């Protein structure tokens, strides 16, 4: 539909609403019945609200047409042409700065107004004005706000209800079909009682279907098919880490219903009796008393919730033998919990007078009316409304008392298809480790996504995935409702656990899909004709199983068979147009079974006359070379190495983890492939101690032969001399030569930046007997950090001790090796603000990192002792920034920036420590997807399960500056889920007197869109260094430590540990005995770990 047709359609909708209002007004004048008048008044109110919404859409369409014809400005489309027309419906899930055309909107990422102060030359200068225009903050509403009767956000509500009602309608139709089968079954059996009961449920199901159709028609009539190109999808629909089922106590009080369409009754009878049924996950939990006045005096229910997602309220009228449903409401329990979290934060910040950045910019008053209104106070006309409940909660909700006892959500909610219901409700989550809400900063451990067991099937790497949304199986087409299923780690193919063994279609994200034998494919090769369509109902992707986003931006439909999918999934859907996936898989299974049956005799006879290689025999030179240097796949899915016909799954797994090909490796891969079976490969793997292709690290290449390669200084030149500004393609090939080298090489050879003409002196092999342990400084997931001194020189070191058993059990071998390589990068230039490594060694049970000892403690300890001033926070931020800049210039993202990991030296400067979550080979444009980090510092793109790049470090840098300036976190909650909700939904608040430069840098670093975030461009740290917050910083003086530090930590002696947590320092510094014995293959995993730095 083009622009003119859309405008005409909206005009017709407006005229229809006006006609309905006119008819309603005439009816009101012609009746004296108060109930009819009340219902007509509600219709008129709704009609006026609809007209305001449609007129706003009309203005938006007209403005777009003017822009298209060259008569408007592209930036004007975000402003309402007529501000008096009421609130502008926001774009769905519109984030701060999403798609703005202002300072960060252009593709070049340039900052046109020039720099100020001491800025690095050649940087893209930031706007020196402290409150230069930034991308607009999004309207702050929750999903619960959208289902409230008086919501201002009609546009997002229409989108939400269209998808929700379509899904509810499809489920109800399935339920009705099942009931009809039961009716026929009981009729055949002659069971009259059961048949009558089933017949009653069938009638009720029919009535609910009519209600749902009526509600759906209402929203479809209001929907305007406008799709903004920069409107983000609702990622919460396809994010497995969000919206988990909750357990706790739900408190619900039902006060009244209003404006509902009551069931018809006879002329002389009394009105129908009305009651409400409450269901939790389709199970009836409560029922109100019947009333004829639409109000209830004391209907309060306390319901224990056990891992549930949704509650359903159904209003019934009983005028005859059977009750008739007249209105329905669905509320997600997670939305209730999220609303209560926001109310607690509002109460705290309203009392303190803090405001969001946009209110500070426009001189607004303290408080958050956008969310305070959304939280809901008692409706003025609410009967018996507990008006004191919200104020009581606002006063006490942040005092650490259980939230469910004080804070209540009190509001009118919209019933479907018509009417409203007045509810007061709260939800107290059951938490294992509840965090006090009213205290400042505290230590938090990092989290890392555990590696799931992989089930290989036809090239797919299926892992068990718990889904918290309604999913659809790609094989059988049935729903997975809040259940665990199987999902391919590569192509995201999703199906039931019971269905994944039946999957015969191959993972076509693999490059070898087109080279597979024809007999393993089906001859039904009719490609789908996918075209974009406007998705205004509940449709699921036929490949990944997620609900398609609303609108036309990311939805495709086959014009022939009607199959729907995401735009990015179209190339993964097999060419089975006109055939269901289940039928296609049955045909393929039959073909393969027939083929295997025909080959059984020939295979048996072939094996009888064949000499098999013993499992322990070393492989030939071709195989050993190929295994010694596994190559990472190029991003393109084409041009993969030849596969081994007898080990399709092994080949597919190998292809997915192999690094970029070098010329020699490419030549190796052109050799004829071996035909050894996968069993022989596995046997050789065990015998030689080599990891399987799946376990082969992407950055660590390890030869299988024991002889060590010779040191070649030329191999290090590309990495040592690579200019910082070289393009990503050049960096990608030059960088691995510096530190992605075989692990068996002597440790001193891996320090690649020493001049080759300086001869390497032989070093004493360092071991456990060289040290005395003095104290425990900290503990982590797999071990502890201990203070130790050398027996000979009495020099102090911090030694990180990790148990090999835990490393292997948690599949962290490669992570440990990567941590060592990042230490090498830090050692390369002895960076002043990075912790240096002196040595590594190992025993039979543990590995040890010998690091420099920083006796001043970490910044978390010091900020708990007292708030940092602006100058002190700015000083530490500048030094941390240079550390991040160095990491990024060397292709490393840090991913765990926090106060706990920033150590303070005795001379007052910082050292960034703990490289356990660092990721290598992350140059500009490179992305990864591991879910890891410390909850309060994790960027939104990590939480949304998106691929992310080095911009996540700049988000964490913004959280760090916020904590140093304000001594609290911008995103808080009582558990990790609440913190994640805050990161995705809340706007950080600031004291009204906070300097504008400080607010500006935080606002730009804490931008949810990574491509718009300060520091996300190709010049990386230069963008942040150019900001006005660092106007007075001389970066050369900071790097060379010529700036006097603002604070010097004090110790009484070199071994004084008073700057470390007493919880750890009070523990006796001993290594606990390890009873388990590691096999030779396990020990082989740590070959080449030992290392001694040249400056040690």
Swiss-Prot record:
E.C. no: 2.7.11.13
Q: Pfam families, per this entry?
A: C1_1, C2, HR1, Pkinase, Pkinase_C
Q: Kindly give the InterPro entries that the UniProt entry links to this protein.
A: AGC-kinase_C (IPR000961), C1-like_sf (IPR046349), C2_dom (IPR000008), C2_domain_sf (IPR035892), C2_fungal_PKC (IPR037778), HR1_rho-bd (IPR011072), HR1_rpt_sf (IPR036274), Kinase-like_dom_sf (IPR011009)
The protein's GO terms of the molecular function aspect are:
ATP binding; diacylglycerol-dependent serine/threonine kinase activity; protein serine kinase activity; zinc ion binding
In Swiss-Prot or TrEMBL terms, this protein is called: Protein kinase C-like
**Which residues are responsible for catalysis?**
896 (proton acceptor)
The UniProt keywords, alphabetically, are: ATP-binding, Coiled coil, Kinase, Metal-binding, Nucleotide-binding, Phosphoprotein, Repeat, Serine/threonine-protein kinase, Transferase, Zinc, Zinc-finger
Q: Which residues form the C2 domain?
A: 231-349
**CDD domains assigned:** C1_ScPKC1-like_rpt1, C1_ScPKC1-like_rpt2, C2_fungal_Pkc1p, HR1_PKC-like_2_fungi, STKc_PKC
Q: Which residues form the AGC-kinase C-terminal domain?
A: 1031-1096
Q: Biased-composition ranges for Basic and acidic residues?
A: 67-79
Give me the residues that bind ATP, please. 777-785, 800
User: Which cysteines share a disulfide bond?
Assistant: none
Ranges of biased composition (kind: Polar residues): 599-622, 746-755
Gene Ontology CC: cytoplasmic stress granule; cytoskeleton; nucleus; site of polarized growth
Q: Where are the zinc fingers (Phorbol-ester/DAG-type)?
A: 459-507, 527-577
């Amino acid at each position: 539909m083009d622009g003119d047709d859309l405008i005409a359609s909206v005009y017709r909708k407006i005229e229809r609403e006006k006609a309905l209002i006119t008819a309603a007004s005439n009816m009101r004048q012609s009746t004296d019945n108060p109930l009819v008048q009340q219902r007509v008044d509600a219709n008129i109110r709704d009609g006026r609200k609809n007209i305001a919404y449609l007129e706003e859409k009309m203005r938006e369409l007209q403005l777009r047409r003017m822009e298209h014809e060259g008569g408007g400005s592209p930036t004007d489309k975000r402003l309402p042409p007529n501000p008096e027309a009421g609130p502008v419906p926001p774009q769905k899930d519109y984030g701060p700065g999403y798609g703005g055309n202002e300072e960060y909107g252009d593709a070049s990422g340039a900052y046109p107004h020039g720099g100020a102060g001491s800025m690095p030359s050649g940087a893209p200068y930031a706007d020196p004005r402290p409150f230069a225009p930034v991308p607009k903050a999004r309207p702050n509403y929750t999903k619960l706000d959208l289902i409230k009767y008086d919501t201002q956000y009609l546009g997002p509500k229409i989108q939400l209800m269209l998808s929700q009602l379509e899904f509810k309608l499809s489920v109800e139709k399935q339920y009705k079909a099942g009931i009809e089968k039961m009716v026929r079954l009981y009729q055949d059996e002659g069971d009259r009682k059961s048949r009558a009961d089933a017949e009653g449920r069938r009638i009720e199901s029919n009535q609910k279907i009519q209600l749902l159709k009526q509600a759906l028609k209402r929203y479809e009539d209001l929907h305007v098919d406008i799709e903004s190109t920069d409107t983000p999808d609702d990622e919460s629909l396809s994010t497995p880490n969000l919206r988990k089922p909750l357990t706790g106590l739900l408190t619900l009080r039902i006060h009244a219903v209003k404006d509902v369409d009551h069931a018809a009754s006879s002329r002389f009878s009394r009105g129908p009796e009305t009651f409400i049924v409450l269901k939790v996950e389709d199970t009836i939990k409560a029922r109100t008393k019947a009333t004829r006045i639409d109000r209830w005096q004391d209907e309060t229910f306390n319901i224990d919730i056990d891992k549930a997602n949704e509650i359903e309220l159904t209003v019934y009228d009983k005028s005859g033998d059977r009750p008739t449903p007249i209105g329905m409401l669905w509320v997600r329990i997670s939305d209730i919990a999220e609303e209560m979290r926001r109310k607690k934060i509002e109460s705290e910040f309203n009392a303190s007078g803090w405001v969001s950045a946009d209110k500070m910019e426009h001189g607004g008053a303290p408080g958050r009316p956008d969310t305070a209104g959304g939280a809901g106070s008692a409706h003025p006309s609410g009967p018996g409304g507990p008006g004191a409940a919200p104020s009581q909660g606002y006063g006490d909700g942040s005092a650490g008392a259980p939230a469910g006892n004080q804070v209540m959500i009190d509001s009118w909610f919209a019933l479907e298809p018509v009417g409203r219901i007045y509810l007061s409700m709260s939800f107290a989550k059951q938490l294992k480790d509840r965090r006090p809400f009213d205290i400042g900063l505290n230590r938090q451990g990092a989290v890392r996504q555990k590696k799931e067991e992989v089930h290989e099937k036809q090239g797919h790497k299926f892992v068990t995935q718990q889904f918290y949304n309604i999913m659809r199986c790609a094989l059988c087409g049935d729903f997975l409702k809040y259940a665990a299923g199987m999902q391919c780690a590569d192509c995201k193919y999703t199906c039931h656990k019971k269905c994944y063994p039946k999957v015969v279609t191959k993972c076509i994200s693999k490059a070898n899909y087109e080279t597979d034998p024809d007999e393993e494919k089906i001859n039904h090769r009719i490609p789908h004709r996918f075209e974009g369509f406007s998705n205004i109902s509940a449709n699921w992707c036929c490949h990944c199983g997620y609900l398609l986003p609303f609108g036309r931006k990311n939805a495709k439909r086959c014009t022939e068979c009607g199959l729907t999918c995401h735009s990015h999934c179209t190339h993964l859907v097999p060419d089975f147009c006109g055939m269901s996936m289940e039928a296609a898989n049955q045909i393929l299974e039959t073909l393969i079974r027939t083929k295997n049956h025909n080959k059984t005799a020939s295979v048996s006879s072939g094996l009888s006359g064949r000499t098999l290689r013993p499992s322990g025999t070393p492989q030939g030179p071709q195989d050993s070379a190929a295994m010694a240097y596994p190559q990472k796949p190029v991003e393109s899915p084409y041009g993969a190495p030849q596969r081994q016909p007898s080990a399709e799954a092994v080949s597919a797994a190998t292809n997915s983890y192999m690094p970029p090909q070098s010329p020699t490796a490419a030549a190796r891969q052109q050799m004829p492939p071996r035909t050894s079976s996968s069993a022989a490969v596995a046997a050789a793997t065990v015998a030689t101690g080599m990891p399987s292709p799946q376990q082969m690290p992407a950055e660590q290449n390890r030869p299988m032969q024991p002889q060590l390669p010779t040191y070649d200084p030329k191999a290090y030149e590309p990495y040592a001399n690579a200019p910082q500004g070289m393009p990503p393609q050049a960096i990608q090939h030059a960088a691995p030569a510096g530190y992605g080298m075989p692990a068996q090489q002597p440790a001193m050879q891996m320090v690649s930046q020493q001049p080759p003409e300086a001869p390497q002196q032989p070093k004493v092999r360092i071991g456990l007997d060289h040290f005395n342990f003095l104290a425990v400084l900290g503990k982590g997931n797999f071990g502890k950090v201990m203070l130790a001194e050398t027996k000979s020189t009495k020099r102090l070191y911090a030694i990180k001790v990790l148990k090999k058993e835990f490393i292997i059990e948690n599949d962290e071998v490669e992570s440990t090796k990567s941590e060592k390589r990042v230490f090498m990068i830090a050692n390369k230039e002895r960076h002043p603000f990075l912790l240096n490594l002196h040595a590594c060694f190992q025993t039979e049970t543990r590995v040890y990192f010998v690091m420099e000892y920083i006796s001043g403690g970490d910044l978390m300890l010091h900020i708990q002792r007292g708030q940092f001033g602006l100058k002190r926070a700015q000083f530490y931020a500048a030094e941390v920034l240079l550390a991040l800049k160095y990491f990024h210039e060397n292709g490393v993202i840090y991913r765990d920036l926090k106060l706990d990991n920033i150590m303070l030296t005795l001379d007052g400067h910082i050292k960034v420590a703990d490289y356990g979550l660092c990721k290598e080979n992350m140059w500009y444009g490179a992305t990864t997807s591991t879910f890891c980090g410390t909850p309060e510092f994790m960027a939104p793109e990590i939480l949304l399960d998106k691929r992310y790049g080095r911009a996540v470090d700049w988000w964490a840098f913004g959280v760090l500056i916020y904590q140093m300036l304000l001594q609290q976190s911008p995103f808080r909650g009582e558990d990790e889920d609440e913190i994640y909700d805050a990161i995705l939904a809340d706007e950080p608040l600031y004291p009204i007197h906070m300097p504008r430069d400080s607010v500006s840098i935080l606002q730009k670093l804490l931008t949810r869109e990574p491509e718009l975030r300060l520091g996300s461009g190709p010049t990386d740290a230069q963008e942040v260094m150019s900001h006005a917050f660092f106007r007075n910083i001389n970066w050369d003086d900071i790097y060379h430590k010529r700036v006097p530090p603002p604070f010097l930590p004090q110790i009484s002696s070199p071994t004084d540990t008073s700057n470390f947590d007493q919880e750890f320092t009070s523990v006796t510094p001993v290594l606990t005995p390890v009873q388990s014995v590691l096999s030779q293959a396990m020990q082989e995993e740590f070959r080449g770990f030992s290392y001694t730095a040249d400056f040690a």
